[in-house]
């Protein structure tokens, strides 16, 4: 039997998704809980391997098991055996041809910036604090240069193991909600650190250090050393993974929850 899970986690205290020796990972904690509930070892496969300190509200995973449990039993049983910063939002029996990574058609991330002169004690994690005033409209304009299929070498980490730097960005929206600026980006897939590297350069534009057209120039140069430093992981969330409709997977609010579900309107401030 193949089971898919919708997972949410705060990545602050984890060295990323992937199991590694001598460090704590999300995969390790989830595999431990699943194996306990299933009463057999179960290897977990995820849609996107998030980096150290990165969060998720819409991670999707799957595993194979001989155990027979109801979807409700999987959800509540796993949550009872997971740490407080990892939660299962749904469980579903899926067809044998489903794969959390290879069946996915798109991934969507949100990057949250707390744009205020002073940091917040209530949100020491889960957002990236930026004290310099940012113009989200300029950031949004700059992001439109990245839409479509391009060579994203200028926004690719040196240690990236992907065979190609080509990716297809479906949308990139930047909007403000009170003191928060949200960068919402969806693509077929992402090269290593791509979202954080793009956000790093958008911050330069939003703060007035670079013009909007700089983003177009960076893209054409295909040189990572010319772009801005990588943005911190604190504000990055994997919020959605898209699959063909026939898998009929449940959907949750994109989140994170404290944002509510913002209405994006680029015709007004």
From Swiss-Prot:
Keyword Ligase: no
One Pfam family recorded for the sequence: PseudoU_synth_1
Catalyzed reactions per annotation: uridine(38/39/40) in tRNA = pseudouridine(38/39/40) in tRNA
One of the protein's GO biological processes: tRNA pseudouridine synthesis
Enzyme Commission number(s) of this protein: 5.4.99.12
InterPro entries per record: PsdUridine_synth_cat_dom_sf, PsdUridine_synth_TruA, PsdUridine_synth_TruA_a/b_dom, PsdUridine_synth_TruA_C, TruA/RsuA/RluB/E/F_N
Superkingdom of source: Bacteria
Presence of keyword Isomerase: yes
Entry protein name: tRNA pseudouridine synthase A
Organism of this sequence: Histophilus somni (strain 129Pt)
